[in-house]
């Protein structure tokens, strides 16, 4: 039997050098680590890793080749009260594995035990890691590097975006390949999108609870192998990486960036009753935040929390991010529950992972977007991230909905959100683009559902409608559900137009949820994380071409307005913005706080957004000059020159002079 050589302690993971494979694994508390390789017949061969450099275990297997399946058994104490849960009866996934063979099914053998260890061997059913070799021709691929001020983000799910698209070949619908198909790229280009933000593509597992209900984790926020692509989105799992890179290369050629939603805050091992896949059995005490009683700090709502202040876990997270940039040429990341990244355990701007990213010549050059909260005390950190980060701006989301759908927001508060929430983000040298403005996202109502439902309808999720937020700031316009009279449909359409205009013509970086531009509905489900079905798949055959054209016209209009693309904070008298009342006069202090919901916003001295958010038709006197309504509010071939706008109830219009 071949013996392992000592090998090298870096890089982490399994790496083929043409002659054999070097294996490395971090564990600060292990007493012994076995590499387990599986031959073509599934026969297991075990080798002790002979090298031990600091906390890195390593060994080199001569003559090993790509395609080799492997895992680890890690020996050490079973001391739950101290956070140690070693169990060599369980085969473990390499945290840095690039490919996984097998499924993460709900099986009692994939649990380590709660108070007492479960010593039943699980190698026969446990997923295995696969050694891969990386040869890919990027040709002349170059990142688009779209300036932040020109960035328009489109948040989409790999499968849901194309699974029902009639113009994409059936065999590639819902896959990585479909993202790079000319039909999809042409659509994004015509819409005006500059960055495609994908829900998680790193390999994830469905929670046992969902599997028992016949459901699955659709969104992907339950990671199990952070360096491996989720194989279900590939035409062939063996070629998933190349399919993904082909799509990125095609998108880059069209000038479209790719941003990955990445989950560094928790793992699919969940709470102490959850499955054992990897980190818990490799070094539970190091990888997770552990309470004094040995249980997990659950700052994520998912059962565990990764300890991103531990040096080895920081190295792991940094290596993971670099992998996606260097190997897949992604252009940035959106970090799920990103407050966890700054926990020490209190949140700090100089937390170790933030510092590592800032000091990294690779990661400091890509787009970084934080979901700036977690569920622990002190977890709401909007506006408090380091200057390299942009942040999801929930202030904008709530303000836009309250202004147009609940009618309870003063003009001053609305204007503050329209001006990139400078009260929140104008600090530490940050620019307006730090505010990622959104009206909707994957999490919550779609835009159409915001105007059709007053209440969530999440019964299909199997939790008796208890899951999902109740703070939706939505308005069904008088009837719960889709459909209704022509008048009802028109009022809902006007509200959608108002919300889209507010999103796409505000200062900051706009993010559009895929499907909002053509009227996609989830029938009132505001937490569709477990709905891998027609509820979440975009139905292109039912798409509203009129709404799509309206959205595209707004995006193209945005790109013409210097005050929005120059990415500079607006200052009094600089010509970027003037705030006027219905008589084209500057608003008084009282009007800002208590005045009627009527406002004119003059941008770059040439573009005028006239707003009447009252219940009555109102005459709005435009400023001096020759104004004409512009698309999408008037046909280019028939401009209306006017001095007074008859503002319909809950209406708005954009003019140019």
From Swiss-Prot:
GO molecular function: glycogen debranching enzyme activity; hydrolase activity, hydrolyzing O-glycosyl compounds
EC nos: 3.2.1.196
Biological process, per Gene Ontology: glycogen catabolic process
Disordered: annotated span: 458-479
Pathway assignment: Glycan degradation; glycogen degradation
Keywords of this entry: Carbohydrate metabolism, Glycogen metabolism, Glycosidase, Hydrolase
Coiled coil location: none
The protein's enzyme class: hydrolase
Active site: 336, 371
InterPro entries named among the record's database cross-references: GlgX_C, GlgX_Isoamylase_N_E_set, Glyco_hydro_13_cat_dom, Glyco_hydro_13_N, Glyco_hydro_b, Glycogen_debranch_bac, Glycogen_debranch_GlgX, Glycoside_hydrolase_SF
Catalytic reactions on record: Hydrolysis of (1->6)-alpha-D-glucosidic linkages to branches with degrees of polymerization of three or four glucose residues in limit dextrin
Site (Transition state stabilizer): 443
CDD domains listed in its UniProt record: AmyAc_Glg_debranch, E_set_GDE_Isoamylase_N
Ranges of biased composition (kind: Basic and acidic residues): 458-467
Family: Belongs to the glycosyl hydrolase 13 family.
NCBIfam families, A to Z: glgX_debranch (TIGR02100), PRK03705.1 (NF002983)
Function description: Removes maltotriose and maltotetraose chains that are attached by 1,6-alpha-linkage to the limit dextrin main chain, generating a debranched limit dextrin.
Protein name: Glycogen debranching enzyme
């Amino acid at each position: 039997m071949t013996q392992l050589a000592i090998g090298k302690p870096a890089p982490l993971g399994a790496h083929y050098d043409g002659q054999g494979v070097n294996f490395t694994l971090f564990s600060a508390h292990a007493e012994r680590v076995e590499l387990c390789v599986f031959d073509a017949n599934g026969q297991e061969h075990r080798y002790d890793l002979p090298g031990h450099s600091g906390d890195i275990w390593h060994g080199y297997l001569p003559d090993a080749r790509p395609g080799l399946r492997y895992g680890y058994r890690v020996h050490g104490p079973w001391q739950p009260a101290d956070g140690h849960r070693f169990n060599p009866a369980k085969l473990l996934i390499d945290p840095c594995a690039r490919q996984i063979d097998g499924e993460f099914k709900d099986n009692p053998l994939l649990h380590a035990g709660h108070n007492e260890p479960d010593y039943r061997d699980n190698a026969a059913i446990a997923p295995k890691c696969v050694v891969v070799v990386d040869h890919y021709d990027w040709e002349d691929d170059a990142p688009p590097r779209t300036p932040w001020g020109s960035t328009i983000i489109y948040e989409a799910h790999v499968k849901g975006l194309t699974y029902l698209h009639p113009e994409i070949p059936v065999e590639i619908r819902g896959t990585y390949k479909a993202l790079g198909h000319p039909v999809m790229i042409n659509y994004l280009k015509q819409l005006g999108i500059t960055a495609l933000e994908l829900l998680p593509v790193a390999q994830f597992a469905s929670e046992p609870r969902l599997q028992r209900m016949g459901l699955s984790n659709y969104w992907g926020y339950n990671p199990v192998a952070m360096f491996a692509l989720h194989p279900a989105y590939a035409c062939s799992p063996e070629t998933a990486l190349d399919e993904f890179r082909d799509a990125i290369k095609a998108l880059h050629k069209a000038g479209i960036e790719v941003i990955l939603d990445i989950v560094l805050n928790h793992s699919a091992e969940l709470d102490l009753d959850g499955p054992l896949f990897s980190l818990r059995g490799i070094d539970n005490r190091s990888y997770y935040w552990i309470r004094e009683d040995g249980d997990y700090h659950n700052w994520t709502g998912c059962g565990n929390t990764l300890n991103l202040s531990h040096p080895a876990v920081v190295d792991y997270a940094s290596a993971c991010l670099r992998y996606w940039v260097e190997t897949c040429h992604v252009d940035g990341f959106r970090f799920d529950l990103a407050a966890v990244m700054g926990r020490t355990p209190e949140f700090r701007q100089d937390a170790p992972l933030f510092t590592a990213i800032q000091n990294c010549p690779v990661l400091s050059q890509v787009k970084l977007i934080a979901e700036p909260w977690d569920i622990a005390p002190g977890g709401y950190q909007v506006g408090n991230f380091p200057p390299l980060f942009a942040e999801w701006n929930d202030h904008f989301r709530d303000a836009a909905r309250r202004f147009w759908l609940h009618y309870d927001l003063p003009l001053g508060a609305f204007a503050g959100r329209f001006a990139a929430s400078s009260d929140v983000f104008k600090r530490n040298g940050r620019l307006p683009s730090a505010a990622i403005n959104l009206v909707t996202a994957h999490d919550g109502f779609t835009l159409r559902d915001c105007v059709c439902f007053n209440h969530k309808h999440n019964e299909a999720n199997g939790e008796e409608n208890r899951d999902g937020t109740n703070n939706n700031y939505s308005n069904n316009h008088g009837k719960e559900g889709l459909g209704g009279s022509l008048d009802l449909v028109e009022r809902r359409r006007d509200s959608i137009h108002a919300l889209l205009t507010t999103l796409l013509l505000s200062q900051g970086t706009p993010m559009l949820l895929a499907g909002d531009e053509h009227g996609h509905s989830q029938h009132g489900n505001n937490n569709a994380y477990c709905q891998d079905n027609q509820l979440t798949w975009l139905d292109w055959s039912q798409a509203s071409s009129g709404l799509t054209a309206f959205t595209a016209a707004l995006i193209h209009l945005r790109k013409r307005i210097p005050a929005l693309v120059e990415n500079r904070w607006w200052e009094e008298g600089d010509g970027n913005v003037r705030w006027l009342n219905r008589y084209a006069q500057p608003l008084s202090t009282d009007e800002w706080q208590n005045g009627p919901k009527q406002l004119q916003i003059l941008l770059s001295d040439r573009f005028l957004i006239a707003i009447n958010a009252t219940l009555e038709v109102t005459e709005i006197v435009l400023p001096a000059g020759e104004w004409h309504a512009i698309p999408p509010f008037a046909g280019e071939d028939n401009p209306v020159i006017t001095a007074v706008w008859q503002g319909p109830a809950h209406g708005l219009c954009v003019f140019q002079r």
